């Protein structure tokens, strides 16, 4: 299955660098791809032409395959009353930094489902792979991508979601376990999160489905890769492992947190963005989730408020509200150039 997947993507190693929005860069993606893995960029939040520019920037750094990731969430609905209540709740936190919360919240991350300019751009640019998070696009759009040679990967957190991915006609399913850093890829968060671990989910999907399975969540070294492959994965997707690479855009505070004692503990929060995500706990995890918290607005409207608070805090040199996403294996992160890290992972896998 590993050989089948690497041939499908045209890569040498069964390792995908996760498309971490806000952390992955064209330089990181290109370095991973040049070293034989599948580098990734995330273009959610970018207009189609900005996404096109990012794709071309990667292409200027590598002639190897790479992946472009988009969010495919159900579009959020504006709710002025709920948004006002949330902003009022956050007002004391803004006041600590001499700032006022925004007057209203914006939909800062359009879903692939609500931006009709993205599909034509992808069909023109033809990256080797396109991956989707939070849901699968309609089957006709998957077929359109495949018709021009693009491989389609979709994240799933349960066997039920994986069945929907298969029904959509995707080429592979990314099995995201509860250990994974960043946003949970749950399709319908209002139904709850099954919280299945990576290895259990990989085994379930490999045993029941026909698609190649990409293991994602908590995998940080070659032994972790080997364990996932032995359980039926065709490849792995690793995010936190690449955050400390010099090619990532993680800032100094994020890097120091990941290298320090805080990396020993990660937690899930919904107050950062409105959707469950795993990271290094800080005041946004706790102060914004204290007793009396009002019902949250939809994702990504919540994230707009958080980003405004982060900006106010950072202006005073405070990083206590930053999104420092990390998986449960964060303490194993290594500060290596991306190509060297990939070579090390391959050596560990084979050792």
UniProtKB/Swiss-Prot annotation:
Induction: Expression is repressed by NmoR. Is cotranscribed with ddlA. Keywords: Detoxification, Flavoprotein, FMN, Monooxygenase, Nucleotide-binding, Oxidoreductase. It is an enzyme of class 1 (oxidoreductase). Disruption phenotype: Deletion of this gene results in an increased sensitivity of the cells to P3N. FMN binds at residues 21, 69, 176, 181, 218, 237-240. SUPFAM superfamilies: Inosine monophosphate dehydrogenase (IMPDH). One of its GO terms (biological process) is response to toxic substance. It catalyses: 3 propionate 3-nitronate + 3 O2 + H2O = 3 3-oxopropanoate + 2 nitrate + nitrite + H2O2 + 3 H(+). This is Nitronate monooxygenase. The gene is nmoA.
């Amino acid at each position: 299955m590993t050989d089948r997947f690497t041939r499908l993507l045209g890569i040498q190693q069964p390792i995908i660098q996760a498309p971490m929005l806000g952390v992955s860069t064209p330089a990181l993606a290109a370095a991973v791809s040049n070293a034989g893995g599948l580098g990734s960029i995330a273009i959610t939040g970018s207009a189609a032409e900005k996404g096109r520019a990012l794709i071309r920037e990667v292409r200027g750094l590598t002639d190897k395959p790479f992946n472009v990731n988009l969010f495919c969430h159900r579009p959020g609905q504006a709710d002025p009353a709920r948004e006002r209540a949330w902003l009022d709740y956050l007002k004391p936190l803004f006041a600590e930094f001499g700032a006022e919360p925004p007057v209203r919240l914006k939909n800062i991350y359009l879903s692939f489902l609500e931006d009709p300019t993205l599909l034509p751009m992808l069909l023109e640019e033809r990256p080797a792979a396109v991956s989707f998070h939070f849901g699968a696009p309609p089957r006709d759009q998957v077929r359109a991508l495949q018709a021009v040679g693009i491989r389609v990967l979709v994240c799933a957190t349960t066997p039920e979601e994986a069945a929907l991915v298969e029904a959509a006609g995707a080429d592979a399913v990314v099995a995201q376990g509860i250990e994974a850093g960043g946003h949970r890829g749950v399709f319908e968060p209002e139904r709850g999160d099954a919280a299945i671990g990576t290895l259990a989910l990989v085994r379930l999907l490999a045993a029941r489905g026909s698609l190649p399975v990409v293991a994602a969540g908590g995998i940080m070294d070659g032994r972790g890769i080997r364990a996932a492959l032995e359980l039926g994965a065709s490849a792995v997707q690793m995010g936190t492992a690449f955050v400390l690479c010099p090619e990532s855009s993680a800032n100094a505070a994020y890097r120091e947190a990941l290298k320090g004692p805080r990396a020993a503990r990660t937690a899930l929060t919904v107050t950062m963005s409105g959707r469950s995500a795993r990271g290094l706990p800080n005041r946004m995890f706790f102060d914004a989730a204290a007793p009396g918290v009002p019902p949250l607005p939809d994702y990504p409207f919540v994230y707009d408020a958080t980003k405004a608070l982060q900006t106010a805090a950072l202006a005073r040199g405070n990083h206590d509200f930053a999104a420092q996403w990390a998986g449960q294996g964060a303490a194993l992160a290594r500060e290596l150039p991306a190509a060297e890290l990939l070579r090390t992972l391959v050596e560990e896998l084979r050792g």
